[in-house]
Amino acid sequence: MELLDKVLEYYKVKNPLVVKHLLIKYMNLVLEKNKLFNLTAIENEEEFVIKHIADSLSLLKFIEQENSNQNPVAIDIGSGFGAPGLFVKIAMPSVNVFLNDSNKKKCKFMNEAKESLGISGVNVVCERAEVLGRKEEFREKFDFVFARAVDRLNVLCEYAIPLLKVGGAFLAQKGFECEDEIDLAKNAIEILGGEIYSIEKFVLPYSDEKRSIIIIKKLRQTPSNFPRNTKQIVKKPL
């Protein structure tokens, strides 16, 4: 696929032939399974390349910029069929990725996909993110947390920040107009031990799709009473 070649060149992905082969295989797995149950609203390959692959790979330069660990550990919350986490793993194999979703069908698919692709350093965790944030084996264990526009930022922060190590970064992928969400999330970010580090706005390559990535750094440990349960997080956001 010429468009995919261009996207991989744009993001300066290493070993592009190997990465391209795996990405196409993964895309085909998603589109085939999508006929049986809903994984994505996107059915066109070129649209998939832009809205899923290019969108996910937009994280790469920020991972490189913020990473002080040779083999960083990242968790993708609300991963769905594995976006952006599995795309990041394919393009940047040094990252150890946990794919988190509470939907059992989607988790089953992600496990099948990683086995089919023959990729190591990928773990699928089928659980609610706020439950993981209270478990010792997950709390404050990650260099990066990814989330793709799955909820409001003030809600996402209570799921994401407890999972980060001090010094780690939450990379929240949002639409272009995100200022109101950021304003509403400032209190939550402060309470949970974080700080807005930067807001990156850009257009996805070979498209007119506008995006933002909000980078939130963790400066101190999250208080032990967070995260709260889902009902409290959603109904009474910080």
Swiss-Prot record:
Enumerate the Pfam families for this protein: GidB
Q: Name one GO molecular function term.
A: rRNA (guanine-N7-)-methyltransferase activity
Keyword match Signal: no
**Cell compartments where the protein resides:** Cytoplasm
| UniProt main location, coarse | cytoplasm
Write the record's keywords in alphabetical order, separated by commas.
Cytoplasm, Methyltransferase, rRNA processing, S-adenosyl-L-methionine, Transferase
Q: Which GO terms describe its cellular component?
A: cytosol
Q: What is its EC number?
A: 2.1.1.-
List positions binding S-adenosyl-L-methionine: 78, 129-130, 148
Summarizing the function annotation, the protein's role is: Specifically methylates the N7 position of a guanine in 16S rRNA.
Family as reported in the entry's similarity comment: Belongs to the methyltransferase superfamily. RNA methyltransferase RsmG family.
HAMAP family linked to this entry: 16SrRNA_methyltr_G (MF_00074)
Q: What name goes with this protein?
A: Ribosomal RNA small subunit methyltransferase G
The organism named in the record is Caldicellulosiruptor bescii (strain ATCC BAA-1888 / DSM 6725 / KCTC 15123 / Z-1320)
